[in-house]
C-alpha cells in the first residue's frame, strides 16, 4: 500500500519523531509506514488522515494507484 505520509509530514514541518509523538507510536513505526514496510491498523490510518485533515483514501493508496 502506497501512502503520502512523508509528503504530508514534511509539508507540516514535522520530524518523524514529532509525528510519532502526536500519534502515540514509535518513530520506527512512522518510518516503516513512510517506506511502505508496514501497513497501519485502521485506527492508526484514520488518526493519520484526521491529523492531516484528509480522508484515508487521500493518504493511503492501493499499490496500483497514485
Locations of regions flagged by a protein language model:
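Short basic helix-loop element that most often maps to the first helix and adjoining turn
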Residues: 3-22
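Residues in the helix-turn-helix
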Residues: 18, 29, 58
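Recognition helix of helix-turn-helix/homeodomain-like DNA-binding domains
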Residues: 25-38
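Short, basic-rich loop-to-helix N-cap that marks the start of a DNA-contacting helix
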Residues: 37-47
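Short, charged recognition helix plus adjacent turn
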Residues: 50, 58-66
Amino acid at each position: 500500500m502506497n501512502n503520502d505520509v512523508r509528503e504530508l509530514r514534511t509539508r507540516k514541518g514535522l520530524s518523524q519523531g514529532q509525528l510519532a509523538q502526536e500519534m502515540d507510536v514509535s518513530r520506527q513505526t512512522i518510518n516503516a509506514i513512510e517506506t511502505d514496510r508496514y501497513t497501519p491498523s485502521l485506527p492508526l490510518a484514520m488518526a493519520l488522515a484526521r491529523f492531516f485533515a484528509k480522508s484515508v483514501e487521500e493518504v493511503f493508496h492501493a499499490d496500483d494507484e497514485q
